[in-house]
Amino acid sequence: MSRAEEAKQQFEKGFLCAPAVLSTYSEQLGLEKTLAVKIACGFGGGIGRTGRTCGAVTGAVMAIGLKHGQVNLADEESRLRTYMLVKEFIDKFTTLHGSIECKDLIGYDLSNSGELRSARESGVFQNKCPGFVYDSARILEDIVL
């Protein structure tokens, strides 16, 4: 099974989008899996169920930071490389899906309780979100890992 499939499977088992992506790669990047799940937890639902940046995207951005992020103030090269890789990731995800915003991707504003209920009833979390998790992981592997 590919790592992208593993991330998708993690999501389908019940992990939120951001933890599903980040935890799939965390141990290879030096972060304990349970800690990765905790760190990424608040990023689900477009960051705290606000419908903003997709959790699958933020999970991948955190993985990019773990792999290439700046570790001290003098390390400007790592910071700039991280920015470049994040931009490349976002460009590729946007090319595939038209946006990185959760509410644009799923068609519901999760910050609105009525729309959240409608989203759940529609099955969007089962029908669309696994694909976003899979694509985020696949793009992450293509450009970073």
Each language-model region and where it sits:
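C-terminal binding/interaction regions
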Residues: 82-145
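Acidic-glycine-rich active-site phosphate/pyrophosphate-binding loop
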Residues: 22-42, 108-113
